[in-house]
């Protein structure tokens, strides 16, 4: 099965390994992502006519909204960016403008393509790095030597390369020439200013400018890898492919969309700039051209997924034009005690497995009794009911509290197997059991 060619059923099966429940949300998102692939198989003229059906996900924090979209984008190798609507300001105000989310998507897309090209050239890059270091470690062969000497040198070079690959010479120091560290560019400024910045930097910081550095062989490997990658990769082709991929397959996840909804409940306290951000967002979601440092990008075929809890507002509090641009609505269920238990026991990379792996590094074995896991799920669920509902994130705070002493004094438990019982969970979370001092468990 190719990741790019996953069917909706295969996508949902993949998501089931990491996210419990939320069948309707998984199904809707899987179809939307599959339609990205279907559209690209059509004739060019028909491709232009088909625009993505943007999705509005409604559900409390910690129920899996972001994780569903992020997981699919990752497995399907699609350009993806997650942003928070509340971080943007209306044009004319101090802060980030909404177009910067598209520029962030393009940056991620170019990086994705660059990493793919590096992976294809991985062996070639590593060979070039090892050869360059080996030649630095071996004294150069004088001119006019016999064929026999040349062969001996070639054999010595080969042996040296093998030792470098095996890490035998990692601590040896060598002097190499590396490019001067490039000046950081603020990608949040408008593209016109970005281009001016880049031109100024190129003028004062020519590519051939290099400095000599004494590094260990291990450090030299990394320094040369980055430099040789730049010489072997076709930068322009990568930029063009990244721009094209963002335009045709990009996904922008806008979290906290409810924070810019103008709620009637707020009365006179409402922020007038919220509606301004919505109106700035509208042309991007509808389809417009945004200038980036890599060139202009059309946004009409980018898939937008908006998400929010909508505790203090309703989806209908968004301006009607923006509501119309998110025709698919999915409501995610709040997490029950049973689902909390399943999250701890059935997901591929459950929180329990993560903590077991972390403590195994210190030589500490951790085992959870089933009753202990059920108690963790129960107490986490109760905490969500009695204070702010933060979904599965509550499990992180409760497990962290239970394992806090073991994590802190891990060296004292090295070589031991520790069993987490129901009684231990209750004693560590006694404030939670007694419904006291809940603030400790609120993120």
From Swiss-Prot:
Binding positions (ATP): 20, 62-67, 255, 321, 393
Record keywords: ATP-binding, Chaperone, Cytoplasm, Nucleotide-binding
Localization: Cytoplasm
A Pfam family per the record: AAA
Primary location: cytoplasm
One function term, GO molecular function aspect: ATP binding
GO biological process: protein unfolding; proteolysis involved in protein catabolic process
Annotated GO CC locations: HslUV protease complex
Domain of life where this protein originates: Bacteria
Entries under InterPro entries matching the protein: AAA+_ATPase, ATP-dep_Clp_protease_ClpX, ATPase_AAA_core, Clp_ATPase_C, HslU, P-loop_NTPase
Function: ATPase subunit of a proteasome-like degradation complex; this subunit has chaperone activity. The binding of ATP and its subsequent hydrolysis by HslU are essential for unfolding of protein substrates subsequently hydrolyzed by HslV. HslU recognizes the N-terminal part of its protein substrates and unfolds these before they are guided to HslV for hydrolysis.
Family: Belongs to the ClpX chaperone family. HslU subfamily.
Subunit structure: A double ring-shaped homohexamer of HslV is capped on each side by a ring-shaped HslU homohexamer. The assembly of the HslU/HslV complex is dependent on binding of ATP.
Descriptive protein name: ATP-dependent protease ATPase subunit HslU
Organism encoding this protein: Helicobacter pylori (strain Shi470)
Name of the gene encoding the protein in the UniProt record: hslU
